Amino acid sequence: MAISKITLAIIVLLLGFTEKLSALSSSCNFPAVFNFGDSNSDTGAISAAIGEVPPPNGVAFFGRSAGRHSDGRLIIDFITENLTLPYLTPYLDSVGANYRHGANFATGGSCIRPTLACFSPFHLGTQVSQFIHFKTRTLSLYNQTNGKFNRLSHTNYFSKALYTLDIGQNDLAIGFQNMTEEQLKATIPLIIENFTIALKLLYKEGARFFSIHNTGPTGCLPYLLKAFPAIPRDPYGCLKPLNNVAIEFNKQLKNKITQLKKELPSSFFTYVDVYSAKYNLITKAKALGFIDPFDYCCVGAIGRGMGCGKTIFLNGTELYSSSCQNRKNFISWDGIHYTETANMLVANRILDGSISDPPLPTQKACKLTKK
């Protein structure tokens, strides 16, 4: 009799273990993605709001300008591809918009904090306000049309969607231009506070599944290396003080996410270490097939100071910016943004969970368990 009880207990344990494995191995089937950020994930907002992001941007994949500051796809594009969802339509784009499977509120030049120093007026707080308005209007129209308007997200998608945030680079890069390392570090708590307010507002609106990208190694951006030639470098050639600030920002961000996991019931947070993935591109550039980690592909018509995609008239002649032919051999597209090849390498690390905490693939980001 004792043997049969032991056997039964083992069977029960095995069944429970099998069920847990099955749950973890299955995909989350996120029906939508709502993204917030800056030009690293802007799929056309700044183009719709201020002016077109001109060619040769987009040439590698889209064959045309597609509102992205890159030669092709961004990290967010690879994420939606992996989730078998369409590319995200910018919230600010009203022509041919389809929000069935989410929307993109990221806008180039945006900061976390509201500041006039940022290129874009659409700081993170504004992006969240836009989302709240978007959700309210969507629910209203959905009810008015009895769910027949198929270009809008389904009413239950908002609680089942994946919410991705990739923003903070501009807060640090702009601040570095007129602050010392220690002065800039002193602003981080306020930046994190603004970020936290945004997350809590999204949670209040029903968001439950969050993928939080930390900031990359801003001190490795070629345009900043050119702007600050006298600043001390790290062993790989990046601006050491600015990367120190980025590391401190990421440390405080991760601590805050750990805290929010406890504060917000039923929330599922994935902290993604984008910094390590992007810094790895720099430190292992040659092995990954890149020529020079600090060179960039899209250059101005009169040198590297004009800007990618811009044109000027010089002595009555219109001059165009151009891009290199060997785009896959470059990390940086224009001195600020990444090439599609670099974006893909970083995205692969995000999607397989190797730089995430907890270390689960993006497709399984809803399977996290509370500790």
UniProtKB/Swiss-Prot annotation:
For this UniProt entry, what's an example GO CC term? extracellular region
Localisation:
Secreted
User: Where in the sequence is the signal peptide annotated?
Assistant: 1-23
Q: Could you tell me the EC number(s) of this protein? A: 3.1.1.-
Q: Which UniProt keywords apply?
A: Glycoprotein, Hydrolase, Lipid degradation, Lipid metabolism, Secreted, Signal
Q: What class of enzyme is it?
A: hydrolase
Active site location: S39 (nucleophile), D334, H337
Q: Where is carbohydrate linked to this protein?
A: N82, N143, N178, N194, N315
Q: Which GO terms describe its molecular function?
A: hydrolase activity, acting on ester bonds
Q: Does the keyword Signal apply?
A: yes
Any single GO BP term = lipid catabolic process
Keyword Secreted annotated: yes
Coarsely, its chief localization is secreted
**Family of this protein:** Belongs to the 'GDSL' lipolytic enzyme family.
Name-wise, this protein is: GDSL esterase/lipase At3g27950
Organism from which the protein derives? Arabidopsis thaliana
